[in-house]
């Protein structure tokens, strides 16, 4: 009988972190670097001041914030130049804190749990990134949608 895979069998151990009180400008730079090179992750693991897991910040979180600003700019009555209002608001994003925009607050999975459980959570919640934590709530890895696809696709298509 084949042993079930655990999260620590498939998780990516090379991942980037950022403090919850960091500014989004710093987070954007880190995410951009992540996307361009290893670990090629769509986000960052967010840490509280004690170094414990606090959440994740993903490209989707940035896009949701931009969409919110876009709607606010378009809704301003009497504004013919919504684009100017939009970019004025965008300049303020950089000073926001990561904790104001991050998602996945406290949503994580344990390193010894079945990978199948992670797959279900990622697929059900439509997550891009799931943090893997140890018994002390310290992040030890990540599982991405891409990793789920890499692990499941061969079973489906071979």
Q: Would you name each region that the model predicts?
A:
Residues 61-78, 148-158:
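A short, polar/charged loop-to-alpha-helix boundary motif
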Residues 18-41, 47, 66, 90, ...:
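The conserved cystathionine-beta-synthase
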Residues 31, 38-61, 122, 130-147:
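A glycine-centered beta-loop-beta connector
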Residues 13:
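Extracellular/periplasmic ligand-binding regions of membrane signal-transduction receptors
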Residues 1-2:
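Extended, non-globular alpha-helical segments
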Residues 79-94:
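Glycine/small-residue-rich phosphate/adenosyl-binding loop
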């Amino acid at each position: 009988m084949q042993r079930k895979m655990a999260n620590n069998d498939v998780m990516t151990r090379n991942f980037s972190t950022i403090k919850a009180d960091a500014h989004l400008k710093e987070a954007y730079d880190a995410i951009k670097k992540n996307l361009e090179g290893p670990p090629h992750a769509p986000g960052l693991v967010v840490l509280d001041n004690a170094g414990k897991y606090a959440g994740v910040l993903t490209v989707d979180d940035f896009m949701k914030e931009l969409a919110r600003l876009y709607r606010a700019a378009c809704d301003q009555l009497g504004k013919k130049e919504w684009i100017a209002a939009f970019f004025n608001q965008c300049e303020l994003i950089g000073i926001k804190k990561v904790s104001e925009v991050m998602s996945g607050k406290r949503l994580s999975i344990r390193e010894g749990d079945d990978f199948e459980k992670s797959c279900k959570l990622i697929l059900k919640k439509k997550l891009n990134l799931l943090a893997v934590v140890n018994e002390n709530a310290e992040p030890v890895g990540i599982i991405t949608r891409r990793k789920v696809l890499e692990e499941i696709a061969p079973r489906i298509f071979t």
